[in-house]
């Protein structure tokens, strides 16, 4: 088992990575401080893992909320479903929420935990690759709004993260590939050696070799933990983790949540960010081609939707959370393993690449 620690002083917490973690309930129980537990999951994950998890939490009073699956369900209505469930069953401040699912479940459960009675404990058990390498770590919680992705939320850290590699065996290939976009992101933005490792291990990753997947997930979580520890509220370096997300969030909002998976939108967003770097003479053509090739190796989209041009992108980008004083801010790769935040991108350059 790999155990990482996200160091945030009193709010520090462990990240456990192993096979069969969902069955290691003694470890899970050690992070639950009182008798009452509510598991939040969805109608895809519940038949796979919910009953077995509940059966092992025999020392606790456990109930559950089962939401519909999909990005479109990460909304204020389902946030209210969770809150109403907790109130109806008279859960108190000592209740622990467990997020059992992918990024949508983790985000909405974390936000409910942040808000219910001004804050209760929650634990992440991410079951998708994307949530394991990115969204379960770092304390970003939110729901979507029709006018923008993740526009209603809070920074609120979990008590622990349990990453069970075995859950990837039930993950559809499209979801796995979408998660690879976030994996590749770490290599592009700040770790050339990891990017090279990914290039060398494409076949092993696609084959689902557990040792390779464990190594890959641990590397991503360590990178995320290091960045979050130095900049929890995204006032500086943490913004680099949004590589591809300025374009990606615009795609998701314009196309309708769930039409494109988040990782698919981020994949295209990273290619567009690299094109922006090319247009600004900040990135070598050879480096751009390697970025595009690695993303394509996992059957991820690399071009924007045909019904989106400059006008559609800019409408959503103006609401981007990274903007400061009305200026659009972009995360741009300047080389494989290097990136920077720029607020000097001209509209002419944007129109050129879009």
From Swiss-Prot:
Transmembrane segment boundaries: none
InterPro entries per record: Dehydroquinate_synthase, DHQ_synth_AroB, DHQ_synth_fam, DHQS/DOIS_N, DHQS_C
Enzyme Commission (EC) number: 4.2.3.4
Positions of NAD(+) binding: 69-74, 103-107, 127-128, 140, 149
Pathway: Metabolic intermediate biosynthesis; chorismate biosynthesis; chorismate from D-erythrose 4-phosphate and phosphoenolpyruvate: step 2/7
Any one Gene Ontology BP term: aromatic amino acid family biosynthetic process
Residues reported to bind Zn(2+): 182, 245, 262
Cellular compartments annotated: Cytoplasm
GO cellular component term, pick one: cytoplasm
Superkingdom per UniProt: Bacteria
Swiss-Prot/TrEMBL cofactor(s): Co(2+); Zn(2+); NAD(+)
Co-factor note (free text): Binds 1 divalent metal cation per subunit. Can use either Co(2+) or Zn(2+).
GO molecular-function terms, A-Z: 3-dehydroquinate synthase activity; metal ion binding; nucleotide binding
One of the Pfam families matching this protein, by short name: DHQS_C
Keywords: Amino-acid biosynthesis, Aromatic amino acid biosynthesis, Cobalt, Cytoplasm, Lyase, Metal-binding, NAD, Nucleotide-binding, Zinc
Family to which the UniProt record says this protein belongs: Belongs to the sugar phosphate cyclases superfamily. Dehydroquinate synthase family.
Role summary: Catalyzes the conversion of 3-deoxy-D-arabino-heptulosonate 7-phosphate (DAHP) to dehydroquinate (DHQ).
NCBIfam families: aroB
Full protein name: 3-dehydroquinate synthase
Organism: Colwellia psychrerythraea (strain 34H / ATCC BAA-681) (Vibrio psychroerythus)
Organism lineage: Bacteria, Pseudomonadati, Pseudomonadota, Gammaproteobacteria, Alteromonadales
Gene this protein is translated from: aroB
């Amino acid at each position: 088992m790999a155990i990482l620690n996200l160091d945030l002083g009193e709010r520090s917490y462990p990240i456990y990575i192993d096979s069969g973690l969902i069955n290691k309930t003694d470890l899970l129980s050690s992070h639950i401080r009182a008798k009452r537990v509510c598991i939040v999951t969805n109608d895809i994950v519940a038949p796979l893992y919910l009953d077995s998890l509940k059966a092992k939490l025999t020392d606790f009073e456990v109930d559950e909320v089962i939401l519909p699956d999909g990005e479109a369900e990460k909304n204020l209505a389902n946030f209210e479903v969770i809150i109403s469930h907790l109130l109806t069953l008279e859960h108190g401040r000592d209740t622990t929420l467990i997020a059992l699912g992918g990024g949508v479940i983790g985000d909405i459960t974390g936000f409910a935990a942040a808000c219910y009675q001004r804050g209760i404990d929650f634990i992440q058990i991410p079951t998708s690759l994307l949530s394991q390498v990115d969204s379960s770590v770092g304390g970003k919680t939110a729901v979507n709004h029709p006018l923008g992705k993740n526009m209603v939320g809070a920074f609120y850290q979990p008590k622990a993260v349990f990453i069970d590699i075995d859950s990837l065996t039930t993950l559809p290939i499209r979801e796995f590939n979408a998660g690879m976009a976030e994996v590749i992101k770490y290599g592009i933005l700040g770790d050339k050696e990891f990017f090279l490792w990914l290039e060398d291990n494409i076949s092993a990753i696609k084959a689902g070799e557990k040792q390779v997947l464990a190594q890959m997930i641990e590397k991503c979580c360590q990178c995320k933990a290091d960045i979050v520890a130095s900049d929890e509220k995204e006032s500086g370096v943490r913004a680099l983790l949004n590589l591809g997300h300025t374009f990606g969030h615009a795609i998701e909002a314009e196309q309708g949540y769930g039409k494109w998976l988040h990782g698919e939108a981020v994949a295209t967003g990273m290619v567009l960010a690299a094109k922006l770097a090319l247009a600004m003479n900040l990135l070598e053509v050879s480096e751009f081609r390697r970025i595009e090739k690695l993303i394509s190796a996992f059957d991820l989209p690399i071009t924007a939707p045909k019904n989106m041009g400059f006008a559609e992108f800019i409408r959503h980008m103006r609401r981007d959370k990274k903007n400061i004083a009305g200026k659009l801010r972009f995360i741009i790769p300047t080389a494989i393993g290097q990136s920077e935040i720029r607020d000097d991108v001209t509209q002419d350059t944007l129109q050129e690449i879009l």
